[in-house]
């Protein structure tokens, strides 16, 4: 009967073929070449391909040189030939055990190996029944047991080789170690499976005396095969799961199953020896082949069981593997010395561990290798030995993905970083979060490491790392490392406009951490980059991207977080009076900083020049309260209130009056300008309405930013005192590098009271006793100033869309036209000496561009600059010949020189040294000619004169607010020149007109296009209306001021809304009180509202919370502001109606509007005279002006009878006190009723409110005071505290 092949029954070779396409020739005999054509079944399962075709050449040679028979003169089979992993074409992983055994990673056929070991009997032993055998780890094909595989004629192919995935871990292979004497922990050689004595002894040890019958072999095999299939699935899944969990074991790490693997390897050697001898004997006796098929299986089964039992006794000696003390290794690498570390490595090497495995073995606690420990602690000799001798990998990463270079850069180890770079470390390697070594060095401020990484390691400067996409410049700026920031910007030209994931630049992150001085450095660097990138063709890549050179540099448009800086200025006061009061020592004084006779006088609080300041060339007086947040309508401009001195205000008011007055004879002198007149009120009325409207608009405007902090001292500047923030110098005009953080020795002597003889002598003699230069030098040495910086940081609101991509590109016009195109209003109002012809400028630009285009595209920037300048600016020429030319010629030459200077800016990026030198010389020559031409045109003189006026007059003097602010001119000019309410200057008006058209006009190479500038001129002309395609208006509009809808009823201004006096601009304090004008309802100081006027009930404006206040205010003259008092002096038909009169006039105007279709409220200015179409106001209704109760006793007047009786009662109460008593005929004293209209009003003496049932004194002038206050007052005089009148 033919025995069925179990391989064909339960195994499908084609379906379960290895993905590596490598199969082992399990029955490969190399005895004869006559059976070479016969292939093993393993080759058939592989589609006829032999595994040897994939073998390396050295494996093929070894296989060809192997002997046909072994030492026992028996054929050698592939089952007994083991191929180590070192010889495999797949490579190998270093093992942690001395026996070099590892748990298999590829074992898809364990089940058939199990079937082969358990097929000898239907009643397997307990050892093979309880669980999988330790040796059943890899499938050994079952067809190795078939007769055709054991025929002596089976010939192996010379190209065959053992599969490393099977043979290396097969339980039927021998140990790869060469023949040698048994080691101490090895078991002695097991007896052969065919030795009956040995077999019987083994069976007796097992306790199993049943011998399987031969004829039951096939049935037992078939029965066991089905169980093996299901078991193989479980075993395969378990092996795959273990492979996922332990995919890679670092070299040198102890495996938990290392002892078991060593035992398995020894048992495999014993089992293979027994099986080989049994199979050899069976082949040598063909007649007994039919009766001894079960012999090998039995022998193998017996040996497996005995090996399992022997594992208990052999496991103890196998667990003597080398244990690595990782803590000691880390300490030796971190602290050394090198000799101890070398001894540690030699000891481990003698125990079976290689130096390569130990040097690259990570610490199980933190994942660091020895190279990481040595690098972060700066052990250069250990790092060098680990790399060159121990074989440490330079690019080995830890759990965070950091290399040794990351560790050295973070710790600042320069020598280690240099050594790593010399051995091939990558300076641009990123860790798991994207940080590079340059990020680490910049974050810690190691300038030497930054230079090393960039110069030698070629690290990328603008690389973005981390989850926030930060650049190295951002890391250095946010941590305040000034030297690194300077080096990255000055030498390596880092891009300051790169944004991180939050849309912030390096400037923003520095401002957010209050590194203000670094913000100043970055601001200057950004401005230089911005100006150097003008007129480029780059376009924004995405919304919100920064395009340098597009328009003016505006920090508020480019950044989200910006600091505002103010200077507190003081001067050393060495006057004789101060020395006498201060014990002979000088003192610092803020008021002395603004002395008029000092050439470097400075306001006590000023804003330095910059992009955010009103001026870019000089310090502007500015208090902390004067700085406001930008509004949503103007998000890129700070709201700043500029302070103007009284003298400058009067001069500017006179100049403004001269512009509006056609004849100079009608102008008033400066001394009369301080007194309000009806004419001044009429001239300023239009300006008052516009200023008030703008003030209300900005007061209610929503801010686009918010403050991150309050005002605080800045100590980030390297030249300031770290404790108090002061800087010391001998003049406020000293350069920044001339200031010192500590008082110099001469200043210290002065502060101690020494070296003041010159100051005292000068004070006594008036300066007449100084004749030599030494005395003058001594006097100058006593002049010292100091300042400190106050900062406040504002940040953009996140809930507002700004559209930076459009706003930043708003000013896309050239800088040349911005300096040249002047408002046509100044040309029309003046004599033509304050501006140049725009038409001439535009014509010159067109001609210059035409000449430049003829040079062709290959011309360099020097040639183009010469062509733009024209022949009039040839080398050696001077503009002296243009002094007598007309202004159009001057405008043309100036325009061409500006274009030439703009073209020469390309020299900043030119690498040609010679050409850059010629461009620099040419630029200096053109700048000289341009200055002379501008001087000839009279452009610089006006600007210098304005600057001189501002320097002389625009200062704040403490306790110097002596001007009563009565001048309407002064008040209105103050309002126009304060903050955002000021009328823009000439250049600002030009810029505003140009910015309205910039979005629709493409930028030109040399400046603003001709159409844009012409449109700006036309838009500035009041008489010009741009024609459109819409239908023409049927109604001809009048020429005159545009009327705006406004509330005709004056409103009572709340106290919390007023911080400064509207008249003089002084800040309200405890000593400077607030006063309401009863006619306009606005708040003024006492000096600006000292006038009294008798108002009608319809004109009164009272507090809405105290409606009964009108009854007391109408009886006597009440407080009005100086402007309302001046307006009341006008004829009735020219006065502005207030209160009820205005409401009734509005009602009449609406009725007239229905009839005539024209508003009766329209006004106009013709020939300089004001004419109003308002009708004379009618008398106030008696019902509205009647008193309902007595103001003294609060008696209802309607119950007293007619008007005569009411007037008599009020007169009697006023004269006799209405139940009160007149103290000595001077004032009336009475108890204040609860319903009195003056309850809640303020006593002018103690500033406390009147309370019901308190004792009140009323003077004959109807002024009310507390009884105790007026008694104390009259002890010092006999004048009313309000009216200063004797009683």
Curated annotation (Swiss-Prot):
Keyword vocabulary terms for this entry: ANK repeat, Cytoplasm, Cytoskeleton, Endosome, Metal-binding, mRNA transport, Repeat, Transferase, Transport, Ubl conjugation pathway, Zinc, Zinc-finger
PAM2L 2, short sequence motif: residues: 941-960
One MF annotation (Gene Ontology) recorded for this entry: zinc ion binding
Entry-linked InterPro entries: Ankyrin_rpt, Ankyrin_rpt-contain_sf, Znf_FYVE, Znf_FYVE-rel, Znf_FYVE_PHD, Znf_RING, Znf_RING/FYVE/PHD
Binding-site list for Zn(2+) 1: 1061, 1064, 1085, 1088
Zinc finger annotations (FYVE-type) as residue ranges: 1055-1129
CDD domains for this protein: FYVE_EEA1, mRING-CH-C4HC2H_ZNRF
Signal sequence region: none
Disordered: region residues: 1-298, 582-630, 643-697, 934-960, 977-1005
Localization: Cytoplasm, Cytoskeleton; Endosome
Disulphide-bridged cysteine pairs: none
ZnF bounds (RING-type): 1243-1283
Protein family: Belongs to the UPA1 PAM2 domain-binding protein family.
Complexes and interactors: Part of large ribonucleoprotein complexes (mRNPs) containing RNA-binding proteins RRM4 and PAB1, endosome-binding protein UPA1, core scaffold protein UPA2 and associated factor GRP1. Interacts (via PAM2 motif) with PAB1 (via PABC domain). Interacts (via PAM2L motifs) with RRM4.
Protein name: FYVE zinc finger domain protein UPA1
Name of the gene: UPA1
């Amino acid at each position: 009967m033919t025995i069925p092949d179990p391989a064909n029954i339960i195994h499908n070779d084609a379906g379960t073929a290895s993905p590596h396409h490598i199969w082992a020739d399990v029955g490969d005999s190399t005895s004869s070449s006559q059976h070479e054509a016969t292939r093993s079944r393993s080759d058939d399962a592989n589609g006829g391909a032999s595994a040897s075709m994939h073998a390396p050449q050295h494996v093929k040679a070894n296989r060809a040189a192997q002997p046909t028979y072994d030492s026992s003169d028996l054929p050698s089979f592939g089952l007994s030939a083991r191929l180590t992993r070192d010889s495999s074409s797949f490579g190998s992983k270093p093992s942690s055990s001395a026996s070099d055994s590892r748990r298999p990673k590829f074992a898809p056929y364990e089940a058939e190996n199990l079937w082969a070991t358990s097929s000898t009997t239907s009643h397997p032993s307990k050892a093979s029944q309880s669980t999988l055998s330790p040796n059943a780890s890899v499938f050994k094909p079952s067809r190795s047991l078939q007769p055709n595989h054991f025929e002596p004629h089976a010939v192996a192919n010379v190209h065959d080789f053992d599969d490393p995935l099977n043979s290396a871990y097969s339980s039927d292979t021998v140990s790869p170690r060469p023949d040698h004497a048994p080691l101490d922990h090895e078991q002695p050689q097991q007896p052969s499976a065919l030795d009956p004595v040995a077999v019987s002894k083994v069976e007796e040890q097992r306790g199993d005396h049943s011998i399987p019958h031969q004829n039951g072999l096939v049935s037992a095999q078939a029965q066991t095969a089905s169980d093996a299939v299901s078991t193989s699935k479980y075993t395969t899944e378990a092996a795959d799961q273990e492979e996922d969990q332990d995919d890679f074991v670092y070299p040198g790490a102890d495996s938990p199953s290392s002892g078991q693997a060593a035992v398995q390897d020894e048992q495999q050697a014993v089992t293979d020896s027994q099986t080989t001898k049994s199979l050899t004997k069976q082949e040598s006796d063909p007649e007994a082949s039919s009766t001894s098929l079960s012999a090998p299986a039995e022998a193998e089964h017996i040996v497996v069981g005995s090996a399992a039992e022997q594992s208990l006794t052999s496991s103890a000696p196998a667990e003597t593997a080398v244990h690595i003390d990782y803590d000691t290794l880390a300490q030796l690498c971190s602290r050394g010395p090198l000799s101890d570390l070398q001894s540690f490595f030699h000891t481990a090497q003698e125990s079976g561990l290689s130096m390569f495995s130990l040097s690259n073995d990570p610490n199980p606690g933190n994942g660091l290798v020895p190279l990481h420990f040595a690098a972060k602690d700066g052990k250069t000799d250990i790092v060098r030995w680990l790399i060159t001798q121990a074989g440490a990998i330079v690019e080995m990463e830890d759990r965070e993905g950091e290399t040794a270079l990351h560790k050295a850069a973070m710790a600042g180890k320069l020598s280690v970083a240099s050594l790593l770079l010399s051995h091939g470390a990558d300076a641009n390697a990123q860790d798991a979060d994207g940080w590079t070594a340059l990020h680490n060095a910049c974050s810690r401020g190691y300038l030497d490491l930054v230079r090393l990484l960039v110069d030698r390691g070629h690290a990328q400067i603008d690389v973005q790392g981390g989850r926030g996409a930060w650049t190295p410049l951002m890391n250095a700026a946010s941590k305040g490392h000034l030297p690194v920031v300077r080096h990255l910007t000055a030498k390596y030209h880092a891009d300051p406009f790169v944004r991180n994931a939050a849309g912030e630049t390096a400037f923003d992150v520095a401002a957010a951490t209050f590194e203000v001085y670094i913000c100043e450095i970055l601001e200057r660097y950004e401005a230089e980059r911005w100006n150097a990138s003008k007129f480029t063709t780059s376009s924004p890549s995405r919304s919100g991207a920064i395009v340098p050179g597009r328009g003016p540099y505006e920090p508020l448009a480019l950044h989200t977080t910006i600091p505002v800086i103010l200077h507190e200025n003081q001067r050393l006061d060495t006057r004789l009076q101060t020395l006498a009061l201060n014990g002979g020592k000088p003192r610092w004084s803020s008021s002395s900083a603004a002395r008029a006779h000092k050439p470097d006088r400075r306001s006590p609080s000023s804003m330095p020049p910059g992009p955010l300041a009103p001026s870019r060339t000089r310090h502007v007086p500015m208090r902390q309260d004067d700085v406001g947040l930008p509004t949503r309508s103007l998000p890129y401009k700070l709201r700043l209130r500029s302070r103007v001195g009284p003298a400058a205000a009067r001069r500017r008011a006179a100049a403004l009056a001269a512009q509006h007055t056609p004849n100079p004879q009608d102008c008033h002198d400066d001394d009369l300008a301080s007194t309000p007149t009806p004419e001044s009120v009429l001239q300023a009325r239009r300006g008052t309405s516009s200023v008030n409207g703008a003030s209300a608009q900005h007061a209610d405007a929503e801010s686009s930013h918010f403050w991150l902090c309050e005002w605080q001292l800045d100590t980030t500047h390297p030249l300031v005192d770290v404790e108090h923030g002061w800087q010391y110098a001998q003049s406020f005009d000293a350069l920044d590098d001339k200031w010192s953080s500590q008082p110099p020795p001469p200043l210290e002597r002065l502060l101690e009271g020494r070296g003041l003889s010159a100051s005292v002598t000068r004070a006594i003699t008036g300066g007449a006793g100084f004749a030599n230069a030494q005395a003058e030098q001594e006097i100058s040495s006593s002049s010292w100033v100091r300042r400190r910086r106050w900062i406040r940081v504002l940040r953009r609101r996140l809930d507002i869309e700004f559209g930076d991509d459009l706003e930043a590109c708003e000013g896309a016009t050239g800088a040349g036209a911005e300096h040249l195109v002047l408002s046509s209003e100044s040309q029309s109002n003046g004599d033509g000496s304050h501006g140049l012809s725009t038409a001439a400028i535009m014509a010159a630009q067109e001609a210059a561009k035409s000449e430049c285009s003829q040079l062709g595209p290959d011309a360099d920037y020097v040639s183009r600059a010469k062509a733009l300048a024209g022949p009039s600016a040839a080398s050696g020429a001077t503009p002296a010949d243009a002094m007598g030319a007309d202004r159009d010629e001057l405008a043309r030459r100036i325009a061409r020189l500006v274009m030439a200077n703009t073209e020469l800016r390309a020299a900043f990026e030119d690498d040609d040294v010679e050409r850059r030198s010629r461009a620099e010389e040419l630029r200096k020559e053109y700048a000289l000619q341009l200055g002379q031409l501008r001087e000839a045109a009279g452009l610089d003189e006006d600007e210098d004169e304005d600057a001189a006026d501002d320097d002389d007059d625009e200062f704040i003097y403490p306790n110097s607010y002596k001007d009563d602010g009565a001048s309407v001119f002064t008040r209105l000019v103050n309002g126009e020149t304060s903050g955002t309410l000021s009328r823009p200057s000439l250049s600002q008006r030009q810029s505003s007109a140009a910015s309205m058209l910039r979005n629709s006009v493409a930028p030109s190479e040399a400046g603003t296009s001709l159409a844009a500038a012409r449109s700006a001129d036309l838009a500035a002309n009041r008489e010009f209306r741009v024609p459109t395609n819409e239908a023409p208006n049927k109604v001809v509009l009048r020429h005159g001021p545009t009327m705006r809808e406004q509330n005709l009823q004056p409103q009572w201004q709340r106290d919390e809304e007023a911080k400064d006096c509207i008249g003089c601009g002084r800040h309200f304090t405890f000593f400077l009180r607030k006063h309401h004008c009863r006619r306009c309802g606005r708040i003024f100081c006492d000096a600006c509202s000292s006038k009294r006027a008798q108002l009608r009930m319809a004109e009164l404006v009272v507090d809405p919370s105290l409606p009964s206040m009108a009854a007391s205010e109408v009886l006597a003259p009440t407080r009005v502001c100086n402007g309302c008092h001046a307006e009341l002096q006008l004829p009735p038909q020219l006065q502005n109606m207030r209160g009820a009169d205005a409401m009734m006039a509005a009602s009449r105007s609406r009725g007239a509007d229905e009839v005539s279709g024209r508003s009766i409220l329209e006004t106009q200015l013709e020939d300089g005279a004001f004419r109003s179409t308002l009708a004379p106001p009618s008398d106030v209704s008696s019902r509205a002006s009647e008193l309902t109760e007595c103001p003294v006793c609060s008696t209802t007047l309607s119950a007293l009878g007619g008007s005569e009786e009411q007037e008599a009662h009020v007169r009697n109460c006023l004269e006799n006190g209405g139940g009160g008593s007149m103290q000595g005929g001077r004032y009336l004293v009475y108890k204040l009723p609860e319903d009195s209209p003056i309850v809640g009003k303020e006593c002018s003496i103690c500033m406390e409110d009147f309370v019901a049932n308190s004792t009140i004194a009323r003077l004959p002038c109807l002024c009310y005071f507390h009884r105790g206050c007026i008694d104390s007052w009259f002890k010092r005089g006999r004048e009313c505290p309000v009216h200063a009148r004797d009683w």
